[in-house]
A protein has these predicted regions:
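Alpha-helical subdomain
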Residues: 1-19, 23-151
């Protein structure tokens, strides 16, 4: 996987932006036990996740940190930079998988610029993204198809 390769070539931190109910930290393989994992998301979601983990008696590994973050707020990155387990000198693997769909185009650009300002050269960012029409505000027009004919 991309994360495993990043760790193999030197990544020491895994930042999961918009972590939601991501479960990597709780099923992490041995090779990942030596990296710091930061789950970043809104307070309510992180709180609910912790409640669910606790009610199912799933312990939080010692290398996992929850950081309440709202990427729309100014200076959200201070929560990461100021966290005692985060080391700005160590390469990071940053996952934005599933997050871009919730951001405007400008918020996405700002997020990438902010990340590039606090992770060192050699770090990685992985993301998925919608096609160019996703950000258009124009509503979709219905198309009716009957027997392979467009009406």
């Amino acid at each position: 996987t991309a994360l495993k390769n990043a760790v193999r070539i030197g990544a020491k931190q895994y930042l999961i932006f918009g972590a939601g109910y991501d479960s990597f930290a709780y099923r992490q393989p041995e090779w990942a036990s030596h990296i710091q994992i930061f789950e970043l998301d809104r307070f309510i979601l992180l709180q609910d996740k912790q409640r669910r983990l606790k009610s199912n008696q799933i312990a939080m590994p010692g290398n996992v940190y929850y950081l309440e973050t709202d990427f729309a707020q100014k200076q959200w990155q201070k929560k990461i930079i100021n966290h005692p387990a985060f080391d700005a000198a160590k390469n990071s693997f940053c996952s934005l998988l599933g997050l871009v769909y919730y951001l405007t185009k400008q918020e996405f650009v700002n997020l990438l610029l902010a990340i590039s300002a606090f992770v060192p050269k050699g770090s990685s960012v992985v993301f998925d993204y919608p096609d160019e029409n996703f950000f258009d505000v124009v509503p979709m027009q219905p198309v009716y198809v009957r027997r392979n004919r467009q009406y």
